[in-house]
Amino acid sequence: PVGTNDKVEQFIRDFLVHKEVKIEVASNPEFLAQGSAVHDTLHAARIVIGTESRHAEKMLQEIYEPFKLPVVSVSRRSAEMIKYACNDFLALKISYMNEIANLCELVGADIEDIARGMSYDTRIGSNFLKAGIGYGGSCFPKDTKALKFIARQYGSQLKTIEAVVDV
């Protein structure tokens, strides 16, 4: 959940309280699709660096510099949230297309034609428009539930994410 890296840092600092060791904890989420981890690593769209330290941010930027990718430098909590927001948005697209597919069956429209027509809209894109039995993988189910849980912990209700989980 959001705030995990804060807890990790505190745990390490408590453990090292009497040692003269300097640590920096950063969040560096991955954005890999199931079955294409190597490709996704080598052809990433961006690198997200979440840190509370300019020193750690600079070190990670130097590590990633040879890849010539956009680097998004944010706080640790924002980096953790970016991961959830991305995965949950993709789950939303899948759930949406499944709902549209159900309606297409009722009205006699072809979901493949609908998806193809939608895919040319640059605001939508062609990814994640395939209707099916729902979203899966190792991240989407746990991340949608996690974001729903996080929102409730903070007294917020994410109706869209709750609908994605329900669909």
Please report, for each region that a protein language model flagged, where it lies by residue.
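Structural/interface elements that position substrates and couple domains in central-metabolism enzymes
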Residues: P1-V167
